[in-house]
Amino acid sequence: ADAFGSITDSLVLKILRGAVKYEYVRLNAAKDVKGKAIYGLLSNLFVERSISNENWFASVAKQYALPSFDRIENSKLVNRDSVSRWMIYFYDDEDGEASFSSFVKTFNDTAWRIVDSSIYVIIESKKGKPVQIYANKNKNEYDGQAKLESIFADNNWDPNVMVHRGHSYYAYKTIEKIHDNTQVFVLGSCGGYHSLSTIIERSSDISIISSKQIGTMFVNNPMLKLL
């Protein structure tokens, strides 16, 4: 499904449209609810790309409306005090060590204030919308993460954005910590794409930014700053 948006060949699109419509009608007749839902969701991909008087996709898509994938309301990205708070989990391995150092340097400019504790850092925006980024130091995987989680719990905060930074075999640890009100989860480890279903099982409405193959700090860190 994620490849459909890049297809521009009109003949290929026509074939795909026909296949989706055929399967939807077939599964509907067979009373296959799950299969029908899958092709109903796929019909959304063709609503704005339909040709001539092909209104079938629009009528089916209304039954399987999808939320926006590339936009989140600002109100959902802040706590009750209008501050957006992030929690970034680093792990004690060679990847975590290099990534943490690069991560902190990314925010070393006049727009941000870096508060350095012995086991974690807090990065705060100096202008614009208030943002606070909490990250444990990679060498303090256990006590640093526990301390930050304690700070959030004591203040009744939710991490609006959660980020996993470390090898993929640590990803499950971060995924298990997803809060009900977390809106964005960034999974930058290699092959993070394979963990999408696990994340969705934890929170069905969460927006996910994930690497497909190789995760690199040279992409992840600048991207986090842009968020």
Residue ranges and their predicted role:
Residues S82-V83, G128, W157, R165:
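Extracytoplasmic
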